[in-house]
Amino acid sequence: MNLLKSLAAVSSMTMFSRVLGFARDAIVARIFGAGMATDAFFVAFKLPNLLRRIFAEGAFSQAFVPILAEYKSKQGEDATRVFVSYVSGLLTLALAVVTVAGMLAAPWVIMVTAPGFADTADKFALTSQLLKITFPYILLISLASLVGAILNTWNRFSIPAFAPTLLNISMIGFALFAAPYFNPPVLALAWAVTVGGVLQLVYQLPHLKKIGMLVLPRINFHDAGAMRVVKQMGPAILGVSVSQISLIINTIFASFLASGSVSWMYYADRLMEFPSGVLGVALGTILLPSLSKSFASGNHDEYNRLMDWGLRLCFLLALPSAVALGILSGPLTVSLFQYGKFTAFDALMTQRALIAYSVGLIGLIVVKVLAPGFYSRQDIKTPVKIAIVTLILTQLMNLAFIGPLKHAGLSLSIGLAACLNASLLYWQLRKQKIFTPQPGWMAFLLRLVVAVLVMSGVLLGMLHIMPEWSLGTMPWRLLRLMAVVLAGIAAYFAALAVLGFKVKEFARRTV
């Protein structure tokens, strides 16, 4: 398997999903603006997403994929099918309980996670109503993530990567065509989330059948393999919960700020997630099963080469992305969101949060490579300890930054914390002699810095000659933005080529 081809496939699917996600956000911003209704929806949508990351894509994948890779490599197909059946049964049971409890306790959940909303009765009631509708998404998307983890282990990377597109399609359809039939209209977005969860699960099931892993969930509290996953999930849930608790605390802080703050941070986060998702999530998706297979087979040299390949690719693409995100923060927010009820002030506030987020983009992406280095070895405790340290320092930074920088201070805390997290993970990988960098890193980084400086000059020059970004229709703004972005990309890779960099070197990494 050529890792670069697999990464390109996953990244292209992820990019398509993110572009569609931007279209979704632009439509939502245009129809609903940034105010009480959108703040209520984003909180109601964020909470199921946080739990989904804890139970499904986060803790569950970290515990499940390395053991699944071991079963696939050593136990045979029949034993693997039984293992999948028992694990899916336990996951379904646990999440069904969480879903029902969350729906019943929605008002109390809001009191804890967004206490500032309690000061406005209408806002609090609307958020509770929306949360009851979106909570089943946890169960649906977690089962979809289980199916995706199995498909990834069988190297069917593009299928799970495409699935999130269906959520965006659902939300766009409901926003455009169903919202007028709901009272209030924002209820349409909540129902779109649940329908999107159903679509993502159903879409992947035929592909699971093709690889012979479509089995009925069964409950067995005594199966050795399933209990290993449960045992690993304990520290994994703690580790992932720490990072999600940090986001919840940020929401609590933001709920006390000016109306619209939650929405401004959400839109900035969506823009920041484009490069982190296209590269970071795609790399993590490919590296976890690949590293797990290398570890299970005892091939430490291949394991080390995979880590080095992933890190170099991170810096190759994340460094220019972070700089470009900061330089283009204004044109991005205006071109994508400043329409209808989304005002110039909303765009400016979103831009400030985006600049703050861009500081930590490299850290956010590098973590996606470094963390699987531990998870693939079934070592979850080390990242957990680092996550706890990061959480404490994040909240200290929140207290320091929220006064002078408001919502942008919360975004800056997340970015700086991501860089700290990545630094500590790297330090532990070196300290435990798990990873040794390959030769040539200094020359590699020097070329990147020079190329980024060239790219920055081109971007600033292009912005100088462009007319005001708020002028013209959305297609015209996006065409101008695309021209600037393409000029920056061309300048960056042209500079690398002049400096003797060969992209072909990355295509040689296979597993």
From Swiss-Prot:
One of its GO terms (molecular function) is lipid-linked peptidoglycan transporter activity. Changing D39 to A/C: Lack of activity. The keyword Transmembrane helix applies. It holds the Pfam family MurJ. The chain crosses the membrane at residues 6-32, 41-69, 83-109, 124-154, 157-178, 186-207, 224-253, 264-292, 303-337, 347-374, 380-402, 410-429, 444-463, 478-499. Involved in peptidoglycan biosynthesis. Transports lipid-linked peptidoglycan precursors from the inner to the outer leaflet of the cytoplasmic membrane. FtsW (AC P0ABG4) is also proposed to act as a lipid II flippase. The identity of the lipid II flippase is controversial with conflicting in vivo and in vitro results. Belongs to the MurJ/MviN family. This is Lipid II flippase MurJ. It comes from Escherichia coli (strain K12). The gene is murJ.
